[in-house]
């Protein structure tokens, strides 16, 4: 049996290298329960991400526009550390945090280029959930 070089239970951690990307894509997925913001380089590799739950909101507060604003600001701040200055925005989903997330990306200092809605629409695919009776 070969001798162990590392102590048991110690994991080798690779540091995140600083990518220098000036232009990228911001993908905002806004569902009824949460908002996820991912900022990628043009080829689709994720540079930074944040979600309403990751920022610290729980339960029904994750679906609010304010939670989406905080998530977008957090993701934009992380992306700016990697040299990001300009983004094209792709919005997906029916949630309430769509416009707020775009506005907060601009407020955080990123220059927003094109805004595109890429919400998937079914050609009569899965049956939707039943209507709520309150």
From Swiss-Prot:
Record's GO cellular component terms: ribonucleoprotein complex; ribosome
PROSITE patterns per the UniProt record, alphabetical: RIBOSOMAL_S11
SUPFAM superfamilies reported in the protein's UniProt record: Translational machinery components
Top-level lineage group: Bacteria
Keywords: Ribonucleoprotein, Ribosomal protein, RNA-binding, rRNA-binding
Family: Belongs to the universal ribosomal protein uS11 family.
Quaternary state and interactors: Part of the 30S ribosomal subunit. Interacts with proteins S7 and S18. Binds to IF-3.
PANTHER family: 40S RIBOSOMAL PROTEIN S14/30S RIBOSOMAL PROTEIN S11
Protein name: Small ribosomal subunit protein uS11
């Amino acid at each position: 049996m070969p001798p162990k070089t590392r102590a048991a239970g110690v994991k080798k951690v690779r540091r995140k290298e600083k990518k220098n990307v000036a232009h990228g894509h911001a993908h905002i997925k806004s569902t009824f329960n949460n908002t996820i913001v991912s900022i990628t380089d043009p080829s689709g590799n994720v540079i930074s991400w944040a979600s309403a739950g990751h920022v610290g909101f729980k339960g029904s507060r994750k679906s609010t526009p304010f939670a989406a604003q905080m998530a977008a600001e957090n993701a934009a701040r992380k992306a700016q550390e990697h040299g990001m200055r300009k983004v094209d925005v792709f919005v997906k989903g029916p949630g309430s945090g769509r416009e707020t997330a775009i506005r907060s990306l601009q407020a955080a200092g990123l220059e927003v280029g094109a805004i595109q809605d890429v919400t998937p629409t079914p050609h009569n695919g899965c049956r939707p959930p039943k209507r709520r009776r309150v």
